[in-house]
Amino acid sequence: FWGSGPFGMFPGGWGGPWNSPWYGPYGGYPYGGYGYPYGL
């Protein structure tokens, strides 16, 4: 998913390439393409 929060400029979330502790253990929660306000 593409986030809409401060880090929303980076692709993240489920299946995203940014799967790291910074973007969340699953690449989406809580700092990836899923978790508000940093994600989805």
From Swiss-Prot:
The protein envelope of the sulfur globules is composed of the three different proteins TR0, TR1 and TR2. To C.vinosum CV3. Structural protein of the sulfur globules, which are intracellular globules that serve for sulfur storage in purple sulfur bacteria. This is Sulfur globule protein TR2. It comes from Thiocapsa roseopersicina.
